[in-house]
Amino acid sequence: MDHLNKIEHIGIAVRSLEEGNALYTKLFGVLPYKEEAVESEGVRTSFFKAGPNKIELLEATNPDSPIAKFIERRGEGLHHIAYAVENIHAEMQRLSAAGFQLLNEEPKAGADNKWVCFLHPRTTGGTLIELCQDRG
């Protein structure tokens, strides 16, 4: 059985969602199709469609949020790669058993009507991986 075989979106950390939206609108030639806040994560997000691909921009709304800490340490740029999964609980169990460190023990409500779980970059070769399942 194939696992993690479809990229759901690519997440990019930005200091300013307005500036990021302007930049990526110029780059892709389209406006973001969605903007929303995820209060529990301390972020505002916007989503772009670039052909078959989705790009998520993330701006911190809380200085203690993971995005604020990421930008403080690394600056703006690629934050995570998200993979679509059909059963997030089963994938979390499979990946945990395979030695990957989950950053949350249960799926959390994320942006774009998804259940999400992140894998620690220490266990994925330095890349933050997000699992995404439609909340339906």
Report residues per predicted region.
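N-terminal beta-strand motif that seeds the catalytic metal site of vicinal oxygen chelate
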Residues: M1-N21, E76-V85, R135
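Vicinal oxygen chelate
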Residues: D2-H3, S46-K49, Y83, H89-G136
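Short, structured motif recognition centered on aromatic/hydrophobic residues
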Residues: I7, Y24, F48, I55-L58, ...
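Short strand-coil-strand connectors
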Residues: R15, K49-G51
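Short glycine/proline-centered loop/turn elements that form peptide/ligand docking sites
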Residues: E19, A37-E41
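Short loop/beta submotifs within extracellular cysteine-rich repeat domains
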Residues: E19-G20, V30-P32, K54-E56, P63-P66, ...
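Conserved active-site tyrosine of GNAT-family acetyltransferases
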Residues: G20-T25, L95
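Intrinsic, low-complexity N-terminal interaction/targeting segments
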Residues: V38, E56-K69, L102, E106-F118
